Curated annotation (Swiss-Prot):
Protein name: Cell division protein FtsL
Subunit comment: Part of a complex composed of FtsB, FtsL and FtsQ.
Name of the encoding gene: ftsL
One GO CC annotation: plasma membrane
UniProt keywords, alphabetically: Cell cycle, Cell division, Cell inner membrane, Cell membrane, Membrane, Transmembrane, Transmembrane helix
GO annotation terms (biological process): FtsZ-dependent cytokinesis
Length: 92
């Protein structure tokens, strides 16, 4: 009878250790899941911000303003356009 009790006690200890280990792993996975979800939210927010920034940078009004203010460009008008004709012999 003592031998059976010892085997049952050992199996009970192994079962308890296995339960503690599985609970610990479950908690670790839950924490990792939370971190991954937070990272996914951050990435989604950054993606939306970048989409808005790209749309802003591609706007024609912004490009026109930058050309006029920063590069000092002016719109072309026909009377200021100079047309150059290539000689009949071609380029040399």
């Amino acid at each position: 009878m003592g031998r059976i009790s010892l085997i049952v006690a050992a199996l009970l200890m192994l079962s308890a250790i296995s339960l503690v280990t599985s609970r610990y792993q479950s908690r670790q996975l839950f924490i990792e899941l939370g971190r991954s979800q937070a990272e996914a939210r951050d990435l989604d927010t950054n993606w939306r911000r970048l989409q808005l920034e790209r749309a802003e940078l591609a706007r024609n009004a912004r490009i026109d303003r930058a050309a006029r203010d920063d590069l000092k460009m002016i719109p072309i008008v026909p009377d200021r356009t100079l047309y150059m004709n290539q000689p009949a012999g071609g380029a040399q």
